[in-house]
């Protein structure tokens, strides 16, 4: 969540709580200027109109997730202590700069984050683990943004050009190009689905046709394959890898949150906020 966004939400919650406790004071003055007066009711309406749906989304999302995927106070406190140790005397300033009112507000954000991480980890099923029970493979690639360019490179490779030299000359992957496109060994699930599907179909030494992924167009060469270990020996490491990859993927987290909210039977009683969950997207965690 962005700090400014959290600050607005926190401020709005406080104001609306005060409003609920004192409706008779809705005409009270919040601020004045020459020929201008801002009443409490006008101020509250503007806040609700501008930020009410964001606030409602955040409140319900946090409530749904933290109640379904419970984490201990000890785990929350450990994360808070880590932050305090990291920032030392600057801890309060860091909270302020990120729009957090106080340590209790920070704890709420940590609790939500830990609960989301727990939800993501529990999303990994036995079927997911078995689907990724594949040997580690080693591959090199040449990455370009244009399909026609990828086809031209493939033609050169088909006529005997060096894969490693073309990778150094043409690849747009700065991390691997100086190594001739070498990506090293990787396990199932480590690469984009498009890349992985193509790579696992290759025989050692074989070069693929151009493969499109969100990163561009890849030409892939399979250069190694490890022996597949017994399932019982590797299933825990496969699960851990999947958990870590999903936790690090913000898109997966957003989709999971949306799925959980759909299952939560949410009913909005305020007509001005009733479309909150059709037009507001999660801000991340």
UniProtKB/Swiss-Prot annotation:
Coiled-coil stretches noted in the UniProt entry, renumbered to this chain: none
Pfam families hit by this protein: Rotamase
Positions where lipid (N-palmitoyl cysteine) attaches: 21
Signal peptide: 1-20
Protein name: Foldase protein PrsA 2
Lipid-modified sites (S-diacylglycerol cysteine): 21
Family to which this protein belongs: Belongs to the PrsA family.
Source superkingdom: Bacteria
Membrane topology type: Lipid-anchor
GO molecular function annotations of the record: peptidyl-prolyl cis-trans isomerase activity
Gene source species: Bacillus anthracis
Enzyme Commission number, as recorded: 5.2.1.8
Location relative to the cell: Cell membrane
Domain PpiC: 134-224
Record function comment: Plays a major role in protein secretion by helping the post-translocational extracellular folding of several secreted proteins. Important for the secretion of the protective antigen. The three PsrA proteins in this organism show different but overlapping substrate specificities.
GO terms for biological process, alphabetical: protein folding
